[in-house]
Amino acid sequence: AALESQGQPLLTEIAALLNVDHVHPIAVEGNTDNVPITGGAFPSNWELSTARASIVVQYLIAHGVSANRLTASGNAEQRPIDSNATAAGRARNRRVEIVMRRLHGAEGEPEAEGASEP
């Protein structure tokens, strides 16, 4: 997996936004279409989706986002956002999502659901 040049300016902007907040954890999730891999550098869509997430994490770290806030994971074809029946749908399913996680119980934020006072 390689970071395409047209995605770099957007990732640079995202890194700048993520650097405004230095607390919340960030999950980077790679995804693929459902076309099985035949040959190439990755034995399956699991490895490809994880590599996609990892390359974005490396880019964010290189642009100042703290590594201890970042996690990378791959979903393979398990979380499509469009139909895999068309080329356009498969293209939309090949993506990386960046999710800022909520801190539960942090000062000024609500406690996790189900938490109660003693």
Language model segments and positions:
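Periplasmic OmpA-like peptidoglycan-binding domain that tethers envelope proteins to the cell wall
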Residues: 2-24, 31-111, 116-118
